[in-house]
Amino acid sequence: MFKKVGKFLAALAAILTLAYILAVYPQVALVVVGACYLAAVCACVWSIVNW
């Protein structure tokens, strides 16, 4: 129960932080989002390859 709440709060904090960065530093946020997207795509491809 507490682990789920902790994960939810961590995700919420990450989203709020990202939103704040997006509002204050748009260029930096775009780079960060692009890097995260690239990492997610790589992880998906890696999991498919190693299925």
UniProtKB/Swiss-Prot annotation:
Keyword entries, A-Z: Host membrane, Membrane, Signal, Transmembrane, Transmembrane helix
Major localisation: host cell
Record flagged with keyword Transmembrane: yes
GO cellular component: host cell membrane; membrane
Record's bilayer topology term: Single-pass membrane protein
UniProt subcellular location: Host membrane
Transmembrane domains' residue ranges: 28-48
Protein's UniProt name: Protein 1.4
Lineage summary: Viruses, Duplodnaviria, Heunggongvirae, Uroviricota, Caudoviricetes
